[in-house]
Structures are given as C-alpha cells and as structure tokens.
Swiss-Prot record:
Cellular component annotations (GO), alphabetically ordered: GET complex
Record protein name field: ATPase get3
Organism: Penicillium rubens (strain ATCC 28089 / DSM 1075 / NRRL 1951 / Wisconsin 54-1255) (Penicillium chrysogenum)
Family: Belongs to the arsA ATPase family.
Gene3D superfamilies hit by this protein: P-loop containing nucleotide triphosphate hydrolases
One Pfam family named in its UniProt record: ArsA_ATPase
Location of the protein in the cell: Cytoplasm; Endoplasmic reticulum
Amino acid sequence: MSSAVVHGDDLDMEPTLQSVLNQNTLRWIFVGGKGGVGKTTTSCSLAIQLAKVRKSVLLISTDPAHNLSDAFGQKFGKEARLIDGYSNLSAMEIDPNGSIQDLLATGDGQGEDPMAGLGMGNMMQDLAFSIPGVDEAMSFAEVLKQVKSLSYEVIVFDTAPTGHTLRFLQFPTVLEKALAKLSQLSTQFGPMLNSILGARGGLPGGQNMDELLQKMESLRETISEVNTQFKNPDMTTFVCVCIAEFLSLYETERMIQELTSYNIDTHSIVVNQLLFPKEGSDCEQCTARRKMQKKYLDQIEELYEDFNVVRMPMLVEEVRGKEKLEKFSEMLVTPYVPPQ
C-alpha cells in the first residue's frame, strides 16, 4: 500500500485536502480516477483553494474530453490563460494530436512539416502515432514547453481516465524508445536525408537531421529531470477521486498500487457523490443507495487508514461556474456536515 505523509503528531488523517495546501514545496499535483467520478470538478476546486495560498497556479487538462472550459464557463486552449475573476490562477487544455504536429514541425512559426516536401510527412506522423502512449508523451512535451516559458509555483493536472493517466506517468520510457527508433532511422537514412535536404535548401532554419535529434535529446534530458521530481514526495502528489461503488473502488486500488510501483506519492482520496438521506426519510432508493455506499466507504476507511479521505456530498445541481466551484471547493478543506 502507498505510504502517506503524516504531518506533525497527527496520527488521525483529517478528512480534508488541507495537508496538500499546507505542503508548500509541492510543484506537481495530479488529480485522477475512473471516468465520471468528478475529477474535473475536484481539480478545479483544488486549484481554487491553492490560488489562495500560492503565488501562481496553473490548471492543465490532459483529458481529450476537455471539461475545464465547461466547468468555468470560459474557453481555454493550448495556451495558458488567466481564469476570469482570478489574478494568479490560469488554465489550459492540451490537444495531444496538435502537439505531435508541433513536434514534427521545426518550430519556424509557420507550422509546416519539414518532411512534407519529401513525401515523408505522413510516414513520420505514422511512426509517431504507432508508439504506444505517444499521445500522453506528446501531452507532456506540450506541458514542458509551457513550463519552461512560463513560471508557475504549482501545477495541477486534471488527468484523463485512469489508463491514460498511468501511461502518461510512464512517458520518459516512451520517449526514450521513440528516440532510439529515430536514432536508428538517422543512422540508416541520415546521410541520404541530409544530402536530399541540402539539395532542397535544408530544413527550415538551416537545421539538419543531427540538429533535430540533438533537440530531441535535450527534450529527453529535461523530461528525465521532471520525472525525478515526480518521484519526490516533497514535490509531487496524486489525489485520487472515486465514488463509493465497487468498480470505482477497484480502479482506485489498482491505480494506487501502480502509483506506488512508480514511486509516486499519494495520500489523499476524494469520495464524491455521497448520499446523506435525512432520518425518517421515506425515499427507499436513497436509503438503499446510502447503505451500499456505506459498505464501500467502510472498505475505503479500512484499506486507506493512512490516507486523507474526503467525503463529498451528492448535490442537487451541477457544479459549473466560478461561484459554485468556490462553494464546492470549501468542502475540500472544511468537512461536509450533512443536515439533520
């Protein structure tokens, strides 16, 4: 089981995310879980709380479904943009496919594929897409570009559903394999390509294949450095989001085991959509569902006694817009007390 970070003499893990806010050395915070359990709402709310205690916060969606724009009622794209009503909270949504196109281009500002004139653009793109997990790797390549050019004290990831997230965290290996393949191709075809490119004026910016590979190697080194930070519990943590149902609990356990195998810290679980029927309620469905939820909540308490387990209620309306998100975010730091 994953190790929890216990602060001070407090052996009873409080049912909030206050420990995440208090840990001011954190630079990377991932929020993830099974699809449909409220990851985006939780990540947006956590980012709002972080903005109260940190100088600058960046919220990034790596989920192809991109729900940040819907959550805040504001359009976000691949460039970081301040969220309306905040001076230190920005958001962006990454398009993995667009990132691949950017990587294959040389960055001359025109967005043109330098291989297109050789009839090799599609081949290189097919090669990139054929590498398992390359969309997650490209997402992170885009993230690195933003991180190196902009300065944020803490970055919150609204991640894709579990499988994508776990692959996303393995991206250094994926990139190294891709670089090995490109190096092999360069050895075989580099001289020929350089001579052809020379006859055609070379790559945009006067680069050759060797320079392109050097850039890729530089990117790999940067990614290796970030990967080291990911495995440092002082700098990185993963907040699991689930609901009190069998499949979600099973997925959460699998995810925590994998995170532990990657040496990535996780000590917080947010359980969403909990029912708290009033005493004497004649709603049979509510009572039956609460009974089922309680069974899985008890299992969560038993399995993760060294975790901060946050219980969030099922709400009567969608959590969309700044005001509702701020109200929801308060329950992440102040335990919800159901009405009697």
